[in-house]
Amino acid sequence: MKAYAVPFEKYVNLADARLGTRAISVTDDWFADVNRLFQPTPAVWKEGVFDDNGKWMDGWESRRKRFEGYDHAVIRLGVPGWIKGVDIDTSFFTGNYPPSASLEACFVADGDPSDATVWTEILPAVELKGNSHHYHEIAFDKPVSHLRFNIYPDGGVARLRVHGIPYRDWSSVGHNEQVDLAAALNGGRALACSDEHFGRMSNILNPNRGENMGDGWETARRRTPGNDWVIVALGHPGEIERVVVDTLHFKGNYPDSCSIQAAYVKGGTDSQIETQSLFWRELLPSQKLSMHAEHEFAGQIAKLGPVTHVRLNIFPDGGVSRLRLFGKVVK
């Protein structure tokens, strides 16, 4: 398993650029583009690289402020959600990081905030250090669509991670409409897995096809009996009718085969669900996989009725780029 610095890191990064997150306004990003904050990859240092405005930095960096005030950016999250925690990452910013930062939030069902929008502070001003991660749990029980990220008074931040549970208004989904119940944009969440040595389990629920092999879930080579697996909580209970297992970019390291189990889980913690998953019913019997391809299954799927969770088993190990679970919502 990959080590998580804090428990809330296992939740979806709502501020991931791959989900569509972007800044809709910023007071100043003279030295470094504010949208670098949302890149899924860790920040990097490029020795001796300069552009027209100065040293190239992997993050958001404003000019030195010579007047009263502070810098801020208004961010539209790629997917609204309930925020569990944030990481304000100042990697490689040493003599140019902000001494402190804060976060405000709002929910706008359609469009972007206006002058009349009411913002709520969800993270009071916290002290920042250079070249460091700053993890903070968030206690706010309402969904958030936009953030205002304030830095005092100026400076640079490498990444802003906003971990939480995605929100979707399921009342707008038609009774016979087929949707991807596992998609991160629809509230799907990877809960646990046997191993994620090379790639995070949450990647398999991202939109679009994978950008490269790193944009997927990949386990270490298995040297003991057994197989690898990942458990996914659906965004909404539903009846699964079609499954897509995509091994894009995985050529010499794709699984030989896969199967899927499923259940309707009414309660329990993530760790309890992990144990229960051993006994879930079979949704998709073992299917052969091939390299670098989308595999679609429909006729092979068992009619289990409504389910809330699935367990993807891969045999014996390897990498999967995306998992799609299409079905109808059960209300």
From Swiss-Prot:
Catalytic activity reads:
allantoate + H2O = (S)-ureidoglycolate + urea
Q: What class of enzyme is it?
A: hydrolase
Instruction: Please give the InterPro entries that the UniProt record associates with this protein.
Output: Allantoicase, Allantoicase_dom, Galactose-bd-like_sf
Listed A to Z, the keywords are: Hydrolase, Purine metabolism
The family database entries (Gene3D superfamilies) matched by this protein are listed as:
Galactose-binding domain-like
Per the UniProt entry, the disulfide pairs are none
Biological or metabolic pathway of the protein: Nitrogen metabolism; (S)-allantoin degradation; (S)-ureidoglycolate from allantoate (aminidohydrolase route): step 1/1
Q: Which SUPFAM superfamilies match?
A: Galactose-binding domain-like (SSF49785)
Q: Spell out the molecular function terms from Gene Ontology.
A: allantoicase activity
Tell me one GO biological process term.
Answer: purine nucleobase metabolic process
Q: What is its EC number?
A: 3.5.3.4
Q: What family, per the record?
A: Belongs to the allantoicase family.
Entries under NCBIfam families matching the protein: allantoicase
Could you identify this protein by its name?
Probable allantoicase
**Recorded name of the encoding gene:** alc
